[in-house]
Amino acid sequence: QFLSLAEAACADMDGEAPVIIEVPDDQASFPASGRHQTYENLLATGDPDFSWHMPEDEWESLSLNYTSGTTGRPKGVVCHHRGAYLMTMGTVVSWQMTLRPVFMAIVPLFHCNGWNHTWMMPLLGGTLVCCRDITASAIYNAIADENVGYFGGAPIVLNMLVNAKDNERRDFENVVEVFTAGAPPAPATLSKIEKLGFNVTQVYGLTETYGHVTECVWDDTRWGDANEDMRAAI
């Protein structure tokens, strides 16, 4: 989908450029170009008898992410195994997740490894639904067709769902749990999206360092009667 952009970026680099690995998708009309190695062919070159080098310490580096520059100049951030593990386990607890959930990946992997939700699915034996194009119709279709129960996204995603046209929407029976972060969602957006079948939890963290370490765990007995502005502020 972004092959031409990647090729142009590599051509504009000084020195040795990264190796491009294609992930073709015939169903989405993105066949292999034949100019680069494909992901499956790359895996086939691996040694099945290779002995893994497991980390000796939980503070060892796990991943290198590059931020999008939303809170400053783009920068590379290293995440350690301990941090990713704690974030993953914390989400499972706060979302009260059970075995075999269905999660839709909307947050990019370069944002704290997709808020570490990527590793949450193998832990629970769940299904990871990937959304190639972040549009209202694509999200509604995934929820209705794949029975998605969880996803995370910025308030712009919530606005997209609230303002979707009738022909972009789909009916679904389950309540979808949503984490939102990046900016405070508008009170009107929160009110409207709850009526559509989404239960939104506001979270806060730093893309540059860790993830959504602070969550607003809703207490309906204390705040259930609050008006829209107060609910949004909480």
Residue ranges and their predicted role:
Residues 1-2, 7-8, 21, 75-78, ...:
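Short beta-strand->loop structural element characteristic of the AMP-binding/adenylate-forming
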Residues 1-41, 147:
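Structural core segment of the AMP-binding/adenylate-forming
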Residues 9, 66, 120-122, 142, ...:
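Hydrophobic/aromatic ligand-binding patch that stacks against planar heteroaromatic rings
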Residues 21-22, 34-66, 73, 96-102, ...:
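Conserved pre-ATP/AMP-binding loop-to-beta segment of ANL
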Residues 37-43, 123, 148-153, 162-234:
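Gly/Ser/Thr-rich phosphate-binding loop
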Residues 44-49, 58, 63, 77-98, ...:
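Conserved structural elements of the adenylate-forming
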Residues 61, 67-70, 103, 109, ...:
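Conserved S/T- and glycine-rich ATP-binding loop of Class I adenylate-forming
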Residues 85-102, 110-149, 164:
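Conserved AMP-binding/adenylation subdomain of ANL enzymes
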